[in-house]
């Protein structure tokens, strides 16, 4: 039996909004430590990994491991019925056919209840190796969103280059080229607006802007974003969901010919 109560439905709504254009069907894997999701996009270029830790729910109960196979378009339709401030409870039996969602209004006595039919989804689990990244950039999530959106008007690809001087996002397109350079700076009054760059060695990689713009839909979940780079390994873009819960996106770099 699974029973998981979220104080704010908005968290799940925003997570699903952020990933539904990348992934159509996926398993929510529930166990006693929380609810996890891992899925590749159709072209196998990007990977989504989410963890909602048990301590983010109150209460949280999961007696045995359950995989909830969900179509994200269908889940979006059900979640539209929830107000952001609603209390959301997820329930499922041990061998479930449906996921039960209950939305309770915190202001009125309204309770909405929906059953979402589940699917059998065969999903391979990819072991994501722990990587020591050459560069880790922590920056305001809306700034990262703006940079990717601005550069996408010029080109399909962006080169992200981190060195001791800062981090540079640059692109070249048919109409010209453009770049944005950020240097480390600390904003004491508004720490969320600080830019931190940790660097063990210089790194320069090229990525598809279409995917990065897509990842930035998760900006609604967190004020800051962490971008981790190493030569020849996928980029990691991580948004915190509070506590040790997270939403992570991995993106393979473009190599030589496909730039």
From Swiss-Prot:
There is a cross-link at residue 164 (Glycyl lysine isopeptide (Lys-Gly) (interchain with G-Cter in SUMO)). CDD domains: PCNA. Homotrimer. Coiled coil: none annotated. InterPro entries: DNA_clamp_sf, Pr_cel_nuc_antig, Pr_cel_nuc_antig_C, Pr_cel_nuc_antig_CS, Pr_cel_nuc_antig_N. Monoubiquitinated on Lys-164 upon DNA damage, and then polyubiquitinated through 'Lys-63'-linkage. HAMAP family: DNApol_clamp_arch (MF_00317). SUPFAM superfamilies: DNA clamp (SSF55979). It is found in: Nucleus. This protein is an auxiliary protein of DNA polymerase delta and is involved in the control of eukaryotic DNA replication by increasing the polymerase's processibility during elongation of the leading strand. Involved in DNA repair. This is Proliferating cell nuclear antigen.
């Amino acid at each position: 039996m699974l029973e998981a109560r979220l104080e704010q439905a908005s968290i799940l709504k925003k997570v699903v909004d952020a990933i539904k254009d990348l992934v159509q069907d996926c398993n929510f894997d529930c166990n006693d430590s929380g609810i996890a999701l891992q899925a590749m996009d159709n072209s196998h270029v990007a990977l989504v990994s989410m963890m909602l830790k048990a301590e983010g729910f109150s209460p949280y109960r999961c007696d045995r491991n359950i995989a909830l196979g969900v179509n994200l378009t269908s889940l979006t339709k059900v979640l539209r019925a929830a107000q952001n401030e609603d209390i959301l409870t997820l329930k499922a039996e041990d061998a479930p056919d449906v996921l039960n969602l209950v939305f309770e209004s915190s202001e009125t006595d309204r309770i909405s209840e929906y059953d979402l039919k589940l699917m059998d989804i065969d999903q391979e689990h990819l072991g994501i190796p722990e990587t020591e990244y050459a560069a880790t950039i922590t920056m305001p999530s809306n700034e990262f969103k703006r940079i990717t959106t601005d550069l996408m008007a010029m080109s399909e690809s962006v080169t992200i280059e981190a060195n001791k001087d800062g981090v540079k996002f640059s692109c070249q397109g048919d109409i010209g080229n453009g770049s944005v350079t950020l240097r480390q700076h600390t904003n004491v009054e508004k720490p969320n607006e600080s830019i931190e760059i940790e660097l063990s060695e210089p790194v320069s990689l090229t990525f598809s802007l279409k995917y990065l713009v897509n990842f930035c839909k998760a900006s609604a979940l967190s004020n800051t974003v962490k971008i981790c780079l190493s030569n020849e390994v996928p980029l990691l873009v991580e948004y915190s969901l509070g506590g040790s819960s997270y939403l992570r996106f991995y993106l393979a770099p473009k190599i030589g010919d496909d730039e």
